[in-house]
From Swiss-Prot:
Quaternary assembly: Part of the 50S ribosomal subunit.
NCBIfam families: rplX_bact (TIGR01079)
Annotated Gene Ontology cellular component terms: ribonucleoprotein complex; ribosome
Function: One of two assembly initiator proteins, it binds directly to the 5'-end of the 23S rRNA, where it nucleates assembly of the 50S subunit.
Domain of life: Bacteria
Secretion signal span: none
One Pfam family, short name: KOW
Official protein name in the record: Large ribosomal subunit protein uL24
Organism: Prochlorococcus marinus (strain MIT 9301)
């Protein structure tokens, strides 16, 4: 999988500062303006899966005799550049920056407000 990604002409891995469990807002695409929690990050592909966003329907055929087919709805991935961290307290989106606090621990904070995330 990694080899196939490297073979793509303009493949560039971006630095993803979004982690699983973060609340994000979609800033581009058909789901623009919606917010949701990050379920999964795929750093090698620069993609994230967000709960309740970019839903796809999948038709599953019956695999055994007597079983009925069904329609599943699941979240598809979004490119990481199309989402931005969302702060519930301040009700705004912001970029994330890393910093080292007084104890020498690396933490994340919002660039706009300086609010420490973790």
């Amino acid at each position: 999988m990694l080899d196939s990604l490297k073979q793509k002409k303009n493949f560039q891995r971006i630095k993803m500062r979004i982690k699983t469990g973060d609340l994000v807002k979609v800033i581009n695409g058909k789901e623009k303006g919606k917010t949701g929690e990050v379920l999964k990050t795929i750093p090698l592909e620069n993609r994230v899966v967000v709960k309740g966003i970019n839903l796809r329907t999948k038709h599953v055929k019956p695999t055994q005799e007597g079983e009925t087919g069904r329609i599943l709805t699941e979240e598809a991935s979004l490119h990481a550049s199309n989402v931005m961290f969302f702060s519930k307290e301040k009700n705004l989106t912001s970029k994330i920056e890393y910093f080292i606090d007084k104890e020498g621990v690396k933490k994340r904070r919002l660039k706009k407000t300086g609010e420490v995330i973790d």
